[in-house]
Amino acid sequence: MSIELIIGPMFSGKTTELMRKINRYILSNQKCVIITHNIDNRFINKNIINHDGNILNKEYLYIKTNNLINEINIVDNYDIIGIDECQFFEENDLEQFCDKMANNKKKVIVAGLNCDFNRNIFNSISKLIPKVEKIKKLQAICQFCYKDASFTIKKHNKNQIIEIGGQDLYVPVCRLCYNNSY
């Protein structure tokens, strides 16, 4: 059917937007599944939770995995597939899984970071983009000047590209404040 990509910096509402879309499909009696990477620690008792603490606890299948291709047989009976924190999946895994599901008449909604704190795109997302029908880029609010923020800076431990954290570790910033921070 199709692939939709929701991207943006930390705290831009990517998971909230994914939750909103999944909820709409649940209300229309579509069978939904939400997948996140094993590294993601924001899921509580099989419920998806965003950084604001809002929980989607409707009827859906929830899967935590580090390999999407291994889940193909499980999700085959579902109409809508939501994938959160897509940047954590391996590039070929994400691209092949999403492409296969869309080709099998599934609606795939993928959410993830637009780039890391060095403003480098994640390989999994760059490989997926050519296969996507729709891209929605969200913005956060710059924590320094309160303008629209398209980037994320890391407060400390800048040698480690992938590190799970929230406001304790990451801050959304605009271009000017990003350049002033590094």
Swiss-Prot record:
Pfam families: TK. The active site is at residue 85. ATP binds at residues 8-15. GO terms for molecular function: ATP binding; metal ion binding; thymidine kinase activity. InterPro entries: P-loop_NTPase, Thymidine_kinase, Thymidine_kinase_CS. Keywords: ATP-binding, DNA synthesis, Kinase, Metal-binding, Nucleotide-binding, Transferase, Zinc. Zn(2+) binds at residues 142, 145, 174, 177. It catalyses: thymidine + ATP = dTMP + ADP + H(+). Substrate binds at residues 117, 161-165. Its EC number is 2.7.1.21. PROSITE patterns: TK_CELLULAR_TYPE (PS00603). Belongs to the thymidine kinase family. PANTHER family: THYMIDINE KINASE (PTHR11441), THYMIDINE KINASE, CYTOSOLIC (PTHR11441:SF0). This is Thymidine kinase. It comes from Amsacta moorei entomopoxvirus (AmEPV).
